[in-house]
């Protein structure tokens, strides 16, 4: 599950900083282990070189690009489906954190918490169960408009948001060359998120939990 944080209003970000520092440390450890596993499996990669080319934190895409450069695969998708597949035993998945803990941390800094593209991660029958648990922690909104949603997905998300008294959000999930089929803002061509969504999110009152 992906939780988006927007519109932080407090000046004390200590809990956010502490959480992110811990996550960065865990990610660095898993990245080093992945590089070690790749090299032991015969896929020559240089982790220092991967880090130098990455803007920000290193993720699976950066490893895929290194494998492309070294001639093992031709595309990032091929890497995800083969060498870097979670089923092959080489890839080291990130250590998951509780969505509820993330929501609490966002609220500690006066932020607005949004469940991103829920129908990508959850089945329709699972979403109400999650929202029932997440709402008391301070979840503010869900993404009802998303690049890969069809009309039925959007209508279902709208009805769920209204049922649980949540604000609505939307996003293209643009990731540059990593998702070439998605354009910034317009998604796959038919996405038009109302500006009113952003205004309501920014104006929302943050409740302490």
Language-model features and meaning:
Residues 1-11, 20, 74, 97, ...:
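Charged catalytic cores and adjacent phosphate/nucleic-acid-binding surfaces used
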Residues 10, 21-32, 57:
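Short, amphipathic alpha-helical segments
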Residues 13, 31, 47, 60-61, ...:
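Alpha-helix initiation and N-capping motif
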Residues 17-26, 51-53, 89-90:
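Flexible, glycine/proline-enriched loop segments at strand-loop-helix junctions
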Residues 25-50:
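Conserved phosphoryl-transfer catalytic core
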Residues 53-118:
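Conserved acidic, metal-coordinating active-site core of Asp-based
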């Amino acid at each position: 599950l992906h939780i988006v944080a927007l519109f932080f209003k407090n000046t004390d970000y200590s809990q956010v900083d502490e959480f992110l520092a811990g996550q960065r440390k865990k990610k660095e450890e898993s990245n080093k282990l992945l590089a070690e596993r790749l090299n032991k499996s015969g896929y020559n990669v240089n982790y220092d070189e991967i880090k130098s080319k990455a803007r920000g934190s290193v993720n699976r895409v950066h490893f895929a690009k290194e494998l492309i450069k070294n001639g093992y695969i031709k595309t990032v998708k091929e890497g995800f489906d083969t060498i870097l597949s979670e089923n092959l035993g080489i890839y080291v998945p990130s250590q998951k954190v509780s969505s509820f803990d993330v929501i609490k941390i966002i609220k500690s800094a006066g932020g607005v918490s949004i469940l991103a593209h829920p129908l990508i991660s959850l089945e329709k029958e699972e979403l109400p169960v999650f929202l029932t648990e997440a709402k008391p922690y301070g979840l503010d909104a869900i993404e009802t408009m998303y690049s890969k949603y069809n009309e039925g997905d959007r209508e279902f998300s709208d009805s769920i948001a209204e049922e649980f008294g949540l604000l609505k959000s939307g996003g293209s999930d643009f990731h540059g060359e990593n998702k070439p089929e998605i354009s910034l803002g317009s998604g796959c061509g038919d996405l038009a998120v109302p500006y009113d969504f952003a205004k309501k999110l920014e104006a929302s009152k943050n409740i302490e939990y």
